[in-house]
């Protein structure tokens, strides 16, 4: 029996677009199996009912279209932001953080419907194939994974369109021509890559930006907002409590209107190549600045520095697709422990692409005006204590300096 004959039912991560519609029909023809479609609403801003109708058109009997926006923000985005996560110092991981949830629900659906395989539409060049499959294998080690882009001979857009035509797959007019760039989006961000953007020496045209106005076109008057945090997570804007997805949606609107969150980056993919991307993360950019600001008065110095030191590793773990790994869980436990006192309010000023904290307060603030004042501190801090502190810290430097002088190295 061939490997194709072993598969009776497969759960496909299905967007309803050209690529995954071709994959759906290809699975039916190549594997002669039942296909179950799963479409996740992660806030990508697209109408998802057409995906359901298209799946029905292909004879799919079990169709899952789910609104996962709240779960996405609460259980994936917010835990990541507690760490102030940036990959290679810049990227807020908007694509990376969406893949574990999709993989998780695919496996849950596969087990619920008795499927023996899962499939995705990620290409063989990118990171997403790794992220999806590491998620699958973490949650169901014996699952069979079908990655059509690594199997089929549809190696060009011309071949994809020809397959679509042969199999009566509807193709919208805008998909018939070569798209100038590829877009991926969710509630946290949008990314644009490829084709028009492949030359990193050429700046992106304004048409590329999907979610933000240009900073130059932003209002000439700053917008000020307050964000309330409880245990490291944002809970309210301007005093109005909101659900996680609603709050991020509102921050996206504020960031969009003020030209905030644009990034043009060349990053190092896990698979080995460098990739140029245009990212827009308006709400996330505000949230990162706000979270760091409330931490500045609530975290102990050494705890804050330790947290900053592990952040690059934590970011790399998520970027590479190891969300369900023991090392990510270990680091998450440490990060979450640090957030117990990260409660309070910050006031942020949004202006022409910039986010600035202009005020912060917390019932757990470690900032003591009695100690730091330039006026009489009434004995709160004895400046003479600094002499011994400096001498002890200088001891190794003085000893090293003496040896260096004797050896002629100073």
Curated annotation (Swiss-Prot):
Main EC class the enzyme belongs to: ligase
Reactions listed under catalytic activity: L-citrulline + L-aspartate + ATP = 2-(N(omega)-L-arginino)succinate + AMP + diphosphate + H(+)
HAMAP family: Arg_succ_synth_type1 (MF_00005)
Cellular component terms per the entry's GO annotation: cytoplasm
Lineage, uppermost ranks: Bacteria, Pseudomonadati, Pseudomonadota, Alphaproteobacteria, Acetobacterales
Family matches, as SUPFAM superfamilies: Adenine nucleotide alpha hydrolases-like, Argininosuccinate synthetase, C-terminal domain
UniProt xrefs under InterPro entries: Arginosuc_syn_C (IPR048268), Arginosuc_syn_N (IPR048267), Arginosuc_synth (IPR001518), Arginosuc_synth_CS (IPR018223), Arginosuc_synth_type_1_subfam (IPR023434), AS_cat/multimer_dom_body (IPR024074), Rossmann-like_a/b/a_fold (IPR014729)
Gene: argG
Amino-acid positions noted as binding ATP in the UniProt annotation, renumbered to this chain: 13-21, 40, 121
Places the protein is found: Cytoplasm
Entry keyword annotation includes Nucleus: no
Subunit structure: Homotetramer.
The protein's Enzyme Commission number: 6.3.4.5
NCBIfam families xref list: argG (TIGR00032), PRK00509.1 (NF001770)
Keywords, alphabetical: Amino-acid biosynthesis, Arginine biosynthesis, ATP-binding, Cytoplasm, Ligase, Nucleotide-binding
Organism of provenance: Gluconobacter oxydans (strain 621H)
Family listed: Belongs to the argininosuccinate synthase family. Type 1 subfamily.
Pathway(s) per entry: Amino-acid biosynthesis; L-arginine biosynthesis; L-arginine from L-ornithine and carbamoyl phosphate: step 2/3
Keyword Amino-acid biosynthesis among record annotations: yes
Binding-site residues for L-aspartate, renumbered to this chain: 123, 127-128
GO biological process, one term: argininosuccinate metabolic process
Residues holding L-citrulline: 91, 96, 127, 131, 182, 191, 267, 279
Name by which UniProt lists this protein: Argininosuccinate synthase
Gene Ontology MF terms in the entry: argininosuccinate synthase activity; ATP binding
């Amino acid at each position: 029996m061939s490997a194709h004959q072993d598969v009776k039912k497969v759960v496909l991560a299905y967007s309803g677009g050209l690529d995954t519609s071709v994959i759906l029909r290809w699975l039916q023809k190549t594997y002669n199996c039942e296909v179950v479609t799963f479409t996740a609403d992660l806030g990508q801003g697209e109408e998802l009912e057409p995906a359901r109708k298209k799946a029905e058109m292909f004879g799919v009997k079990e169709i899952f279209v789910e609104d996962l926006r709240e779960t996405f923000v609460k259980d994936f985005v917010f835990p990541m932001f507690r760490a102030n996560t940036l990959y290679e110092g810049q990227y807020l991981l908007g694509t990376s953080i969406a893949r574990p949830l999709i993989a998780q629900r695919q496996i849950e659906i596969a087990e619920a419907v008795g499927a023996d395989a899962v499939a995705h539409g990620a290409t063989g060049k990118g990171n997403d194939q790794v992220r999806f499959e590491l998620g699958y294998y973490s949650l169901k080690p014996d699952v069979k994974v079908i990655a059509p882009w690594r199997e089929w001979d549809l190696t060009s857009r011309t071949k994809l369109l020809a397959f679509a035509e042969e199999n009566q797959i509807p193709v919208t007019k805008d998909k018939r021509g070569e798209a100038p760039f590829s877009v991926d989006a969710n509630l946290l961000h949008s990314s644009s890559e490829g084709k028009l953007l492949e030359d990193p020496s050429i700046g992106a045209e304004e048409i590329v930006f999907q979610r933000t106005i240009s900073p130059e076109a932003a209002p000439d008057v700053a917008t000020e907002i307050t964000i309330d945090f409880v245990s490291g997570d944002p809970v309210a804007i301007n005093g109005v409590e909101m659900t996680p997805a609603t709050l991020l949606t509102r921050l996206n609107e504020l960031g969009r209107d003020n030209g905030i969150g644009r990034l043009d980056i060349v990053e190092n993919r896990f698979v080995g190549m460098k990739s140029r991307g245009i990212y827009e993360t308006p709400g996330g950019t505000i949230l990162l600045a706000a979270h760091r600001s409330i931490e500045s008065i609530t975290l102990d110095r050494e705890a804050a520095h330790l947290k900053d030191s592990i952040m690059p590793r934590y970011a790399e773990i998520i970027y590479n697709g190891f969300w369900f790994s023991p090392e990510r869980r270990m680091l998450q436990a440490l990060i979450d422990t640090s957030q117990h006192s990260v409660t309070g309010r910050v006031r942020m000023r949004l202006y022409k692409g910039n986010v600035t904290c202009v005020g912060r307060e917390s019932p757990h603030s470690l900032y003591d005006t009695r100690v730091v004042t330039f006026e009489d501190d009434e004995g709160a801090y004895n400046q003479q204590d600094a002499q011994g502190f400096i001498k002890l810290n200088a001891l190794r430097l003085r000893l090293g300096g003496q040896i260096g002088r004797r050896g002629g190295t100073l």
